[in-house]
Amino acid sequence: MALLRKINQVLLFLLIVTLCGILYKKVHKGTMLRNEADDDSETPEEMEDEIPVVICAAAGRMGAAMAAINSIYSNTDANILFYVVGLRNTLSRIRKWIEHSKLREINFKIVEFNPVVLKGKIRPDSSRPELLQPLNFVRFYLPLLIHQHEKVIYLDDDVIVQGDIQELYDTTLALGHAAAFSDDCDLPSSQDIHRLVGLQNTYMGYLDYRKKTIKDLGISPSTCSFNPGVIVANMTEWKHQRITKQLEKWMQKNVEENLYSSSLGGGVATSPMLIVFHGKYSTINPLWHIRHLGWNPDTRYSEHFLQEAKLLHWNGRHKPWDFPSVHNDLWESWFVPDPAGIFKLHHPNS
């Protein structure tokens, strides 16, 4: 009898240890992406009316996120909830910038991204080191940011929105599609685009087709690529298809086999998405992602074309807050000065 009691005590102890381990794992995972405003409660009706927009605010280019937010908020009557994502050491500065500027009226939540989630998943070598910044991979983890919403918009920080964001949010996603992107071959004014020397618009520019792992995918290198700087995502499908896990798998494969970090496109975050979403995404109206404004400081779009655009994206090295850059006047019209005086424009006349 005493032996049986002792065995039961041991089994009970092991059960408690196991439960504690599971609980710790869940809590630890939850800290990778932590929402400062998780205590805020919202009714189902309020959540239905909200348009969640995720945008990252990196330390060295926080003014970009603020300009993007200003342009979105100023051009719509919709109820926008901004999820502003940053690293721990920038969260107080993000809040100060919003609350001590014209942006104080926006509805927002500040979210901390813990880069520990990326440990062992990123190769250190890249033709563009800035693309290795942790916040560049936030788009992979949208379901850990958005818990209440079925649909979400993700935007890169180097964009300006000139249309009503409600139109972008209303983008139709086909059954079984977790996201919508802009096809690189569907850009308007393609004759202007082709003058941008070195621009990549096919999978060949992002994947290394010399590697067997890439060849085995069976994807033609001439397949049109897409740009993940503007995403309309369905969170239910994203979770159902385990998109985040798939993306992490292709990050890990790149660490082991160097599948795309040396590609012409330099698309460290783009390449895994091209693989995971191949043939399984919906498309965004081309006017809602006019891009490559940061590709070449000597190439300009026509003013009429830019006025028609709903969203402008300065992807590339030449950002509108730096010099040299093009069409920076359009970006500056939405710039919100930094209350702390840290972020400054680098233009000859600024």
UniProtKB/Swiss-Prot annotation:
Transmembrane stretches, start-end: 7-24
Cytoplasmic side: 1-6
Record flagged with keyword GTP-binding: no
Positions on the Lumenal side per record topology: 25-349
EC number assigned by the record: 2.4.1.-
CC terms in the record's Gene Ontology section: Golgi apparatus; membrane
One Pfam family from the record: Glyco_transf_8
Sample GO molecular function, one term: UDP-glycosyltransferase activity
Domain of life: Eukaryota
Keyword Cell inner membrane listed: no
Keyword annotations from UniProtKB, A to Z: Glycoprotein, Glycosyltransferase, Membrane, Signal-anchor, Transferase, Transmembrane, Transmembrane helix
Compartments, record wording: Membrane
Membrane topology listed for this record: Single-pass type II membrane protein
Glycosylation: residue positions: N234
Predominant location category: membrane
Broad enzyme group: transferase
Family: Belongs to the glycosyltransferase 8 family.
Protein name, per record: Glycosyltransferase 8 domain-containing protein 2
Upper taxonomic lineage: Eukaryota, Metazoa, Chordata, Craniata, Vertebrata
Protein encoded by which gene: GLT8D2
